[in-house]
């Protein structure tokens, strides 16, 4: 899991939690990483921001060790990336060309006693359930087609 910081065209920041099963973030080159964009809340805050301002900040936190790692760089995304076939549930692949990678002081990280991936995390052989909030009357009509209830 990690936190992804983006900013819109006017520089207004946004931060999102990104999660998946172990290995959903891939190191794809000496200074490049990639991760899938899964079905979300339909607001496209991260991807919308990346489309107009590719600068991103990523904070990885290992609550068990504890350790933190920061990655700052420029992101792009594609729906025809070869990694799509390797990451079940991916709607797009986001690639980040790292400009800075550095550890961050872990002294205030609280400890977590083991964790399992969310039941909503896409993976091979598992169909995530539809989140209850996507069935609420006040959001159904504004969700993208793939996100709407059946």
Residue ranges of each PLM-predicted region?
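Binding-site signature for planar aromatic cofactors or substrates
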Residues: 1-150
């Amino acid at each position: 899991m990690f936190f992804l910081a983006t900013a819109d065209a006017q520089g207004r920041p946004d931060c999102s939690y990104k999660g998946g099963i172990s290995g959903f973030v891939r190191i794809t080159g000496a200074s490049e990483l990639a991760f899938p964009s899964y079905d979300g809340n339909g607001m496209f805050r991260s991807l919308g921001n990346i489309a107009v301002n590719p600068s991103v900040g990523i904070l990885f936190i290992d609550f068990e060790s504890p350790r933190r790692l920061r990655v700052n760089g420029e992101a792009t995304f594609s729906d025809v990336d070869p990694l799509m076939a390797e990451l079940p549930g991916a709607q797009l692949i986001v690639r980040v060309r790292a400009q800075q990678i550095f550890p961050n002081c872990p002294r205030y990280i609280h400890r977590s006693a083991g964790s399992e991936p969310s039941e909503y995390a896409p993976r091979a052989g598992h169909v995530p359930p539809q989140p209850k909030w996507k069935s609420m009357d006040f959001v159904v009509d504004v969700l993208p087609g793939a996100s709407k209830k059946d």
